[in-house]
Amino acid sequence: MKQLITLLFCITAMNSMQSQSVVGKWKTIDDATGEAKSIVEVFSKSGKIYAKVVDVLDPAVKYNLCKQCPGDDKNKPILGLNIIKGLSKDGAEYNSGEILDPKNGKLYKCALSLESKDKLKVRGYIGFSLIGRTQYWYRVN
C-alpha cells in the first residue's frame, strides 16, 4: 500500500512539473496589434531550449521566406524555422540564447519565463534586458 501511495505521488508530481514547463506549443501574439500570428513549438534538445514555427496563422504570409535572416536561415521558409536557439535554465528563467525576428531578420538575446502554466513571457533584447521588448505567448492544448 505504501508503494502504491508513493507511486501515485510521483505520477502527480511529474504531471505537475510537466504543466510548469516551457516545452509545448504556444500561440504567439503580435505585441503591436494584439493579433495571433503563429504557433511555435518549444522543445528541449541536449539540455537546451529551442523553438520552431509550426504554423503561420495568416494565409497571406504562411509560405513566406526569411529573406533578411542571417547565415543558414537566409531565404528559408518561416514555417519550420527555428526562432529560439540555445536557451539554458537559470532558476525560473531560460536565457543565454537567441531569438530571431523573422520579420526583420535580426537576432536578439532572449529570456523566457512562465507567468502561469499557460502564459509564457518572451523577452528579446540587445545588450541588457532593459533595452528590448516583451511578448506574451499562450499555451495551445
Regions found by a protein language model. Name each.
Residues 35-100, 107-108:
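Central antiparallel beta-sheet cores of small beta-barrel/beta-sandwich binding domains
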Residues 69-74, 121-127:
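Short aromatic-glycine motifs in intrinsically disordered, low-complexity regions
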Residues 117-119, 126-141:
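Edge beta-strand at a domain terminus
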Residues 1-21:
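Bacterial Sec-dependent N-terminal signal peptides
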Residues 21-34, 53, 96-98, 137-138:
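Tryptophan-anchored aromatic micro-motifs
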Residues 35-39, 105-109, 123, 131-134:
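Short, surface-exposed coil-to-beta transition loops
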Residues 44, 89, 114-115, 139:
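Generic beta-strand structural signal
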Residues 31-33, 102, 113, 127-128:
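Short polar/acidic secondary-structure junctions
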